[in-house]
Structure formats: structure tokens, C-alpha cells
């Protein structure tokens, strides 16, 4: 139906529209200083060295476009929800495959992208994950979940552009708020491949996360 086939190039949607309210800073956390430059530029510079990525779309407020001056990127405007921002970025995508990455995650590794893309070519969608190191309890009713059956989801995620578009449209029609991008494939009853991370994954949500990101370099 979707003609899942191999194509060597992907677009990258780099999400940079978040407000960063939980971080408590006076500016969105993706623009906080990290090794002498805004945090998001660390991810962008890593992405520019990844051969599978042929174009990058930054989803950000117009007031922050100047941060990306001199970089070969396109721009799209953020929406109210994550899925609205992703849909906005998709309007600029020129490739049949797309990677989606959070701007508050400073690391995007070439070997993991290669494995993600290879897996997505087989199924239509793939996400980076890691094992759950803790005991997890469901709240209502209270019970202990089997952590060996669970995974922590990270970005980037790779998905066929057509699948992501149709899944987002389905979510909007059914008033479903997506919590990650490969959930769009799940809504269409399509498989999602899980690719386990080879490197530590950091999402900068709180100040201590930024300290940890520095320590990983």
C-alpha cells in the first residue's frame, strides 16, 4: 500500500518550538548556551555530518530564526501541539522519508541514524529506544509492570513521509494527541521497528540534564 522501498536520503525535521516552562529559564531551553553556542546548534551540527540527511527543516518561532543564520536549513512554524509542529515541518519536506528529532536533545549519532533508516526501510517506521532500568508501577489500578516488555522512547525517529502525513491526519480526525511520531504508524495499524541506542541519550528537561549533557562530551 505504501510502497516501502529503499531511498538513500531523508529529510530531518528539527523541532525547536517548545517553551521550556519546566526548565525555569528566561528563554526556551533549546537556545540555552551549550559549549559556547545554543543547545540546538549542537544537534544541528551533528546532523549536517550525517550522509542520510539531505535537507533539514527547523520548526521554530520566527524570532529565533537568526540563530540559524548561515546554516543550510528551511523553516516552518510551530503549532500548539507537537504533532501540529511536525505537520507544519512536513509541508517543507522534499524526500519520501523523514527523521524527526527534538531540539532539546543535543546528540544525534550517525551510526544510530544509519540503523534507524535501515530498519524503517523494512517496516515503514522506526524509533530509537533504550531498556527500562527501573521498576515501573501502573497507578490505577496499582500493579507492577514487566519492564522487560517496555522501552524508553527517544529521538530521532524515522518514518515514511506518506505514513506520517496520513497518521497525523487520522489523529486529528479522531482527536488523538500523539506522544511520539511513530504512533502515527500505529494508528494506521502499521509496524514500528525498535532500534536500541548505542550511545547515552539526553533530553534536556531540567537544569541537571544540561549538566549531564556536558559530562557526556
Curated annotation (Swiss-Prot):
Site features described as Transition state stabilizer, chain residue numbers: 22, 29
Entry's family note: Belongs to the IspD/TarI cytidylyltransferase family. IspD subfamily.
Family annotation (CDD domains): CDP-ME_synthetase
Protein name according to UniProt: 2-C-methyl-D-erythritol 4-phosphate cytidylyltransferase
Catalytic reactions of this protein: 2-C-methyl-D-erythritol 4-phosphate + CTP + H(+) = 4-CDP-2-C-methyl-D-erythritol + diphosphate
Pfam families, sorted: IspD (PF01128)
Keyword check for Transferase: yes
Domain of life: Bacteria
Recorded GO MF terms: 2-C-methyl-D-erythritol 4-phosphate cytidylyltransferase activity
HAMAP family: IspD (MF_00108)
GO biological process: isopentenyl diphosphate biosynthetic process, methylerythritol 4-phosphate pathway
Presence of the UniProt keyword Nucleotidyltransferase in the record: yes
Uppermost EC category: transferase
Keywords tagged on the record: Isoprene biosynthesis, Nucleotidyltransferase, Transferase
Documented EC number(s): 2.7.7.60
Positions marked as site (Positions MEP for the nucleophilic attack): 147, 203
InterPro entries to which the protein is assigned, alphabetical: IspD (IPR001228), IspD/TarI (IPR034683), IspD/TarI_cytidylyltransf_bact (IPR050088), ISPD_synthase_CS (IPR018294), Nucleotide-diphossugar_trans (IPR029044)
Organism: Chlamydia abortus (strain DSM 27085 / S26/3) (Chlamydophila abortus)
Pathway given in the UniProt record: Isoprenoid biosynthesis; isopentenyl diphosphate biosynthesis via DXP pathway; isopentenyl diphosphate from 1-deoxy-D-xylulose 5-phosphate: step 2/6
Function field: Catalyzes the formation of 4-diphosphocytidyl-2-C-methyl-D-erythritol from CTP and 2-C-methyl-D-erythritol 4-phosphate (MEP).
Amino acid at each position: 500500500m505504501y510502497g516501502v522501498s529503499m531511498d538513500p536520503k531523508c529529510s530531518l525535521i528539527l523541532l525547536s518550538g517548545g517553551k521550556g516552562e519546566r526548565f525555569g529559564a528566561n528563554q526556551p531551553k533549546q537556545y540555552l548556551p551549550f559549549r559556547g553556542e545554543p543547545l540546538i546548534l549542537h544537534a544541528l551540527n551533528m546532523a549536517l555530518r550525517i550522509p542520510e540527511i539531505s535537507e533539514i527543516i527547523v520548526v521554530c518561532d520566527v524570532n529565533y530564526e537568526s540563530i540559524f543564520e548561515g546554516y543550510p536549513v528551511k523553516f516552518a512554524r510551530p503549532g500548539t501541539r507537537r504533532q501540529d509542529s511536525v505537520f507544519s515541518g512536513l509541508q517543507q519536506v522534499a524526500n519520501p522519508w523523514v527523521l524527526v528529532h527534538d531540539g532539546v536533545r543535543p546528540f544525534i549519532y550517525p551510526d544510530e541514524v544509519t540503523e534507524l533508516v535501515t530498519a524503517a526501510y523494512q517496516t515503514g517506521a522506526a524509533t530509537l529506544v533504550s531498556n527500562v532500568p527501573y521498576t515501573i508501577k501502573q497507578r490505577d489500578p496499582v500493579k507492577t509492570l514487566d519492564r522487560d516488555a517496555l522501552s524508553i522512547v527517544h529521538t530521532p525517529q524515522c518514518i515514511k513521509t506518506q505514513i506520517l502525513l496520513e497518521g497525523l491526519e487520522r489523529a486529528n480526525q479522531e482527536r488523538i494527541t500523539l506522544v511520539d511520531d511513530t504512533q502515527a504508524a500505529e494508528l494506521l495499524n502499521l509496524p514500528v521497528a525498535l532500534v536500541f541506542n548505542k550511545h547515552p541519550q539526553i533530553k534536556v528537561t531540567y537544569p541537571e540534564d544540561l549538566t549531564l549533557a556536558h559530562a557526556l562530551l
